[in-house]
Amino acid sequence: MSDTDGKKPLGLGGGRSGHVKQSFSHGRTHNVVVETKRKRVVVPGKTGAAAGGGRSGSPSAVSGDPSKRPAGISDAEMERRMAALRAAKAREVEEAAQRIADEKAREEERERRRLELEAKEREEREREEALRLKAEEDERRAREAELREKKKAEIAKPKTEARPATPADRAAAEAAAVRAETKGVSAAGPRKTDRDRDTRGGGGDDRDSRNKGRDDSRRTGKLSLSQALDGEGGRQRSLAAMKRKQEKARQKAMGGNQRAEKQVRDVQLPETIVVSELANRMAERTPDVIKSLMRMGMMVTANQSIDADTAELVIDEFGHHAVRVSDADVEQVIDQVEDKPEDLQPRAPIITIMGHVDHGKTSLLDAIRHANVVAGEAGGITQHIGAYQVKASNGAVLTFLDTPGHAAFTSMRARGAQVTDIVVLVVAADDAVMPQTVEAINHAKAAKVPMIVAINKIDKPAANPQKVRTDLLLHEVVVEAMSGEVQDVEVSAKTGQGLDTLLEAIALQAEILELKANPDRPAQGAVIEAQLDVGRGPVATVLVQNGTLKRGDIFVVGEQWGKVRALINDKGERVDEAGPSVPVEVLGLNGTPEAGDVLNVVSTEAQAREIADYRIQAAKDKRAAAGAAITLDQMLAKAKADENVAELPVVIKADVQGSAEAIVQALEKIGNDEVRVRVLHYGVGAITESDIGLAEASQAPVIGFNVRANAPARNAANQKGVEIRYYSIIYDLVDDIKAAASGLLSAEVRENFIGYAEIKEVFRVSGVGNVAGCLVTEGVARRSAGVRLLRDNVVIHEGTLKTLKRFKDEVKEVQSGQECGMAFENYDDIRKGDVIEIFEREEVQRQL
């Protein structure tokens, strides 16, 4: 024996190896060597104990032997350190034990789940096997019944074939016998020999019982002679058909033959919907929906849109219910909940000061606020809506809105009347009721708000308050002094007379109104003014009407949305929130809103963006619908009318939205049937290069109202020759535009009659034609003037003179009482007794 007999060869330890055979399709196999490594579990408790045992004497030795102890450590300190060390070791042991227990629990849980999964899979396999066996048994019985019926039919046939058998008949009979024998063998199933059972093992009997009665001709692929002669082996059901039949039988056994009841759905139907989306919402096939539409005469594809009415017909045809929804439903997220009475709290009144221009509205408000706003207004007139809060002597807080009085600011006054609680109508005692006073009265009546009349400038010598009261009667405003219900107060903004009485009247009116609001809800307010600030971006002056607007709130206002970045009150101070009746400047918008838009606070940024997008699309659709409503005839008629109309294009940029609107409205009123002003674009903010490009393309001037052009815009204007005009007073702007538009008017031609001449004789002159010998009876006859030939006071000819002679000399003019000779240009039909009317044309420039 060798040295290695009975010894294991050397190798890597720590693992066990084995072989696993992987089977693939087409009989391919692959051997894989699998090595399993075992992990050595180290129990911390035992290790620690052993280690501790080895060093058990050290701490005591250290603590007992002062020479081995670290310097400066007392016995008590050493004992504490040792106790802490022992506690740490104990914790480590506990944690290790807990980890082992957790791992064991997880392993048990995994084993339990594996067993459950295996049991479930086994049950599923057994159930499927039972269903398969049942289906095969049913199929076998059906075949046997069919065979029995066929045999009975053959036996019942009348035996009329009793005639001498021919060789062909004998061959057919033998084939039939063989065929019957083959079928019997197939029905009974293939026999297995004992050797087959021994070879395949003990499970052969079970397989024979399962396969009993199965037709194996499809599997063996063999074809007997009798089958070939009989034709049975020709066209048979495919293997896929057999599988489908088995699947149907399995579903039938499981109860799948019951037809699923159709589910009726509520289909949300917008104004327009894509065909594929409609099919998806109905849970129907898209081709079925397209077929339904084609039956209606609509040739559509899956990606085409259809209107709501057509989609509703399709939904009804498929048996579902249509639920109409509108795109406007996105605005339902805006809180419109009615406030409970117990949540309402008193709020400050909102007072709008209105009246004619230069009647002292801003001066009166300055006197109340003890400020001086008039000095900062261009031209001494208000051109913006100002919002202020004033604290009265009794402690009450009042919110004032100062509106412009100029005729161009009608829309501003209308907005001021819509958001106010009380209107203070300022009328100058020395000027009485004026056009904008009447307009302010109409705005207050339309808004159904109470009115207080403040008769201003009573300190002037020409003041006549009684005339003001009388003039107001003409407009159905009856003051208390005239036995009416409207309060009237005589005040002087200059001397301060009557201001306390005015504030008392306002407080009394506010007390009667019982103004309340709920501060504990999402804010809602109105945009008083909006502008585009160079450093701060879009800024909106908002008057909070309900709720509390806080910094960080997400809001939607008109077609814009944003997040409150900062709130600035009327004193220029930053605040964190603004309650009801508080005017603030809001920063954080994504664009400049329109003055008069309503601000609503929403929950999320997505909601705000969705509402703003819907409003933008709705505005586009409205403009498109307005353009589409014009017929071709109307369009041609308008184009023909515009051919004779001269246009003055302008580009308007203003500091605030309200001023821009007022300028546009004022310019639209300029013009007549021959000339008009066309505003190409108006906006808020500084003049930019894009404005210059637009103006250059249309050969229009750029009007800047309280704004200036930036450096690139100025350079572009100089290069392209675009005129930029700056204004700070709306009077001057309107007057200049009106003068420029007047220059487009064609000059008016006026005729001045300068004389008459009577024809005394007619002479025929060769080379010249007929020449009239005339006597100037009135005025003077000039060679350059126009003439008309009158016969019996009827104009026969109008033209010019070819020649004017005095005796034989050509002269420029002939005075009254003198004789002369006249010949007409291209006209000879003159007679004795006709009268010649002499006139001159003069062009006069027209004004709008």
Curated annotation (Swiss-Prot):
Compartments where located: Cytoplasm
Family: Belongs to the TRAFAC class translation factor GTPase superfamily. Classic translation factor GTPase family. IF-2 subfamily.
Binding site for GTP: 355-362, 402-406, 456-459
Origin species: Paracoccus denitrificans (strain Pd 1222)
Protein's name according to its UniProt entry: Translation initiation factor IF-2
Lineage: Bacteria, Pseudomonadati, Pseudomonadota, Alphaproteobacteria, Rhodobacterales
Keyword Phosphoprotein found: no
Any one GO molecular-function label of the UniProt entry: translation initiation factor activity
Gene Ontology, cellular component aspect: cytosol
Positions of the UniProt region annotated as G3: 402-405
Record Gene3D superfamilies: P-loop containing nucleotide triphosphate hydrolases, Translation factors, Translation initiation factor IF- 2, domain 3
